[in-house]
Amino acid sequence: MKLKISLLLAFFLYLTVIPLSGQYVIKGRVSDAKNGDPIPFASVGLVGVSQGATTNFQGEFTLNSKYSADSLFASFIGYKKRVKKIKNGSLFQEIDFQLAPTDQVMAEVKVYSGENPAFSVLRGVVRNREKNDRSKLTAYEYDSYSKMELDVDNISEKFREKKVMKDISQSIDKFEKIAGEDGKLVIPTYISESIGKFYYLENPQRKKETITKTNIKGVGVKDGSIISQLVGGNLVANYNFYQNYVGFFGKDFASPIGDNWKDHYNYFLGDTVNVDGHICYKMDFDPKNPMDLVFRGQMWIDTTSFALVQIDASVEKGANLNFIEKIKISQELEQTSSGAWLPARTRFLIDLEEITKASAGMLLKMYISNKDIVVNKPHPLGFYDVASEVAEDAMKPDPAFWKYARHEPLTTSDLLASALIDSVQNLPIVRTYVEIAELVVSGHRRFNGLEAGPYITSFAINKVEGARFRLGFRTNANFNKNWILRGNVGFGTKDLVTKYALEVNYLFSNKKWTMAGIRHSYDLERVGLTPDLIGDNKLFYAFTRWGAFSGAFFRRESEAFFTSELSKGITLTTSLNTRSFDPLFRFQFRLNPELGTASEVQDHYQETFATVELRIAKNVTFLMNGNERIALATKRFPMITLKYQHGFKGFLGGDFTYDRFTLKAYQTFRLGSLGRSDYTFTAGYTPSNLPAPLLFPHLGNETFFFVRSAYSTMSYFEFVSDRFASIQYNHNFDGLLFNRIPLIKKFKWRLIASGNILMGSQRVENREIMKDVNNPLRSKFLDRYTFDSLDPNKPFAEVGYGIDNIFKILRIQAFHRLSYLDHGNPRRFRIMASVNFSF
């Protein structure tokens, strides 16, 4: 009887436990507690039971178990392990984990016999790079879906006390707050999604992205024109770890599978795992010097092809970077029909630290999903001319389109972020902060279609004008997409002269960038410091308006111009100008220097000239900003400008017939762990006989503000040439030296060095034009300048060195003048400063 009861009890347990055991299902998501970013390949398991699962690229997991347990754990390298209780008797549960980052460093691995087993795998990766790297492809393209989100995080107590935060908190109290389990509030300020296609051509290298639809919502986002060109993400986040260095923020980060992998990383080879059907080596990598620009993380290498299948790489706070709490790149790659691997999914995260205790941090998250990959089918070269194209109806709402076109549905967090932005962006205090931010960034205050500014040039005090007041304006695309107006008016309290400028442009095409316009202006300028010589450095130009204002002259100028992009990266500009020169210093020249003292003397002049300029910028990418365009710097090739000018005597009052030729080449390039460099080569020549201001006055710098294009130990208009060649070279070593010096390395300083060499001369005929001329009409002016020439056999040279990144924004440089040390009152040694915002 007892045996029957025992058998019956056992049979009952079999019927109740065993069938139900197959129905225990636990689903969930593992994410970073600080920023909400998913954690791929995290381990999830039942406590006390040898059964578990790993998360996918989205950080999601599904655990099916025959056994029950009272708790579930989640763990991943670089994060604190977390355990949660399981509801007893529940057959289906959802449990999410938020793992807190830890500062732990990978334990040292000692190999007592033979080499590290990871090294043979890495050599296999390098050996098979040519067949696995996407660079072997002549071209590729794919459908792409991307999401981008910008949040405010790390909200300090002082920042919470600000009125803007109190108003925001009241607005979002009705919503469920977006936060991790650590309770830290995250406030979304911008969210976008886009869908389109990405095209790549290897030789010559071209990138093109077309945006079919985009959905943008953000605090302060008034016009999505330029933002819509960036939301695709492939133009800025197309990372390739097969290259020796992965570049972003103008920095080079050593790849863990690059040629120099052994110099930068420690490696630990783990077990083999299955990743989407590929049996892979799991490998951890850790920086040898945490301050270097390197990664920490894990990667999965295919055991057959030695291809990179997936990587999870982070740059942490200890690296020599500014304002960065963390950078994280997760990439999942897919093999194409050609054998090369392309990214199927990419996650990119930047966590910016709070700059002060009274501020907050920022969090940028980007996700890109690619599918329907086509390889080795290049389009005609002209197809790639426009780097970013946005469909005319791209921003038109279309819920039905998004429902079927998204590669995956929006998450609950995405939907909540969108609702929060709608609530926050209409607050008056938020709109005020947005307007202040726009003013700081652009220098202009927007009033719908009109923008006032730039404010940096609105006021100055100098000895000629007294207090100078200036008000400027420009129109934007809200005024008119084709017509562009600019102008300003100024007045000096001492000279009592009104200055003004007006410009009218018409944009014929923004694809081939074809524009025509006219300008007219009357203003007080300085020899060698005019806007056409200084360029776009508005800060330096504003500084030159203050103080003694030596070399001053009034200029009246009229110009008509036409510019057009002939082909990708090649722009032609033609113009006709008439320009006067009326100096406020003792200035005279001989109209006919061959007559010597018998020549007629003149103290002012007028020139009429035509200009043809050809600019070649290979591989440059342009983005449209309304009716303006912004150039993203070309990397591998120099930007070259060729200019020819011809003066017409007797036409529109011109006093001279002349020819001028100039050549300028500028290039910036990165040298991996050695830092980054840039150089500017400039040359000019005129065969004509002209007064000094019409030759080539070399740009000196008498301020304490460093200007890259100026000679730091040269005075204003100290030297003038009718033929010259110069090279200006700058190099930033980043943390190459200071990262290795104890005590100093904690400051994250960066060593910089520079050198400038100028060769030039003046022909005798040009020196005779202004030699020993004494015009009593100009005797009332005390200032007189010799406009000396350089010795053709003796270059002007100066060298500089200094420290960058002092307090994260300040650069201090020392300059030594190496030649012309007995010329006048030379500036042999100078200390200069500049503000430099960089990561």
Regions found by a protein language model. Give the residues of each.
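A short, solvent-exposed loop/turn motif at the edges and junctions
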Residues: 46-48, 71-84
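Extracellular beta-sheet/turn segments enriched in Thr/Pro/Gly and aliphatic residues
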Residues: 87-113
